[in-house]
């Protein structure tokens, strides 16, 4: 009886072990942690230019003036670790200084922000091992669309949410709205990762695989955010070492950890499709044998 149970358990866990082995093999071959380090470096260089471009877009639309403040607080409260308020103050100072630049400097900011998107494109297509390339004009159009429409859509959604919350009939739904707002960061992360894994690769990505990989990445992102905040709160020894500069290594580590999660979700998405193809090929080979 016990032997039968072990045999059945082995049959059920064998595919999982094979898939995990394939996942680890791909992570090792793609040098995922090195790719994450490259993206973290480019992100830190592009962070202020990217935020400056986004805020400039909001400034161009007076209707979004109040929403931009809400969006700023929402991002730093839900997508940054416990020191988000400190990082927010520094970044806002940097952005305020960048607003004093000339037209040439502003163009440099835009180019730097677009370089981050190019780096993300290259890293994801390296993981998908896609040799296809988009026309440069098409790639630029996609990057610019993400850079402009993304913040505006986020601002519009926050404006609609604020309007609905201000309605009288919505006061009876406070409990429901509170519960929705709690899971909103997870949902936004899931949708963002899904769009990233579906649109950026130059090869076709099965929608189901992208949803699974994005969901795992979103869960890891939320868990990592909570764990990182707990570590900062419970073990403040880094403050004794770095003092007032403690926020710098925290930001570096958080950006690197975030890119590790993003690329791991991409590896999971790719591995799901590759494992399915290998399994189908093995079954076809067995069927062809006399």
Curated annotation (Swiss-Prot):
Pfam family, one: Virul_fac_BrkB
Domain of life of the native organism: Bacteria
Cytoplasmic side: 1-43, 125-139, 204-209, 265-290
Any one GO CC term of the record: plasma membrane
Protein localization: Cell inner membrane
Keywords: Cell inner membrane, Cell membrane, Membrane, Transmembrane, Transmembrane helix
Membrane topology (Periplasmic): 65-103, 161-182, 231-243
Classification via HAMAP family: UPF0761
Recorded family membership: Belongs to the UPF0761 family.
Protein known as: UPF0761 membrane protein YihY
Gene: yihY
């Amino acid at each position: 009886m016990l032997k039968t149970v072990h045999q059945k358990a082995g049959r059920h866990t064998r595919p999982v072990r094979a898939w995990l082995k394939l996942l680890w093999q791909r992570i090792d071959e793609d040098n995922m942690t090195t790719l994450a380090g490259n993206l973290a470096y480019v992100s830190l260089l592009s962070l202020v230019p990217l935020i400056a471009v986004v805020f400039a877009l909001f400034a161009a639309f007076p209707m979004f003036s109040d929403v931009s403040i809400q969006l700023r607080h929402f991002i730093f409260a839900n997508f940054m670790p416990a020191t988000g308020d400190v990082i927010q103050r520094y970044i806002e100072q940097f952005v305020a200084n960048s607003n004093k630049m000339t037209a040439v400097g502003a163009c440099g900011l835009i180019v730097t922000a677009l370089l981050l998107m190019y780096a993300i494109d290259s890293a994801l297509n390296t993981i998908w091992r896609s040799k296809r390339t988009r026309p440069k004009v098409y790639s630029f159009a996609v990057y610019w669309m993400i850079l402009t429409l993304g913040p505006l859509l986020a601002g519009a959604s926050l404006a609609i949410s604020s309007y609905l919350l201000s309605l009288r009939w919505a006061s009876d739904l406070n409990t429901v709205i509170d519960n929705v707002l709690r899971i909103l960061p997870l949902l936004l992360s899931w949708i963002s990762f899904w769009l990233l894994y579906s649109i950026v690769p130059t090869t076709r990505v099965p929608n189901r695989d992208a949803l699974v990989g994005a969901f795992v990445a979103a869960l890891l992102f939320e868990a990592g955010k909570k764990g990182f905040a707990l570590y900062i709160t419970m073990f403040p020894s880094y403050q004794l070492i770095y003092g007032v500069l403690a926020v710098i290594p925290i930001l570096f580590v958080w950006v690197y950890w975030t890119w590790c999660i993003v690329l791991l979700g991409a590896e999971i998405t790719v591995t799901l499709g590759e494992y399915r193809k290998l399994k189908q090929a093995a079954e076809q080979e067995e069927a062809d044998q006399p």
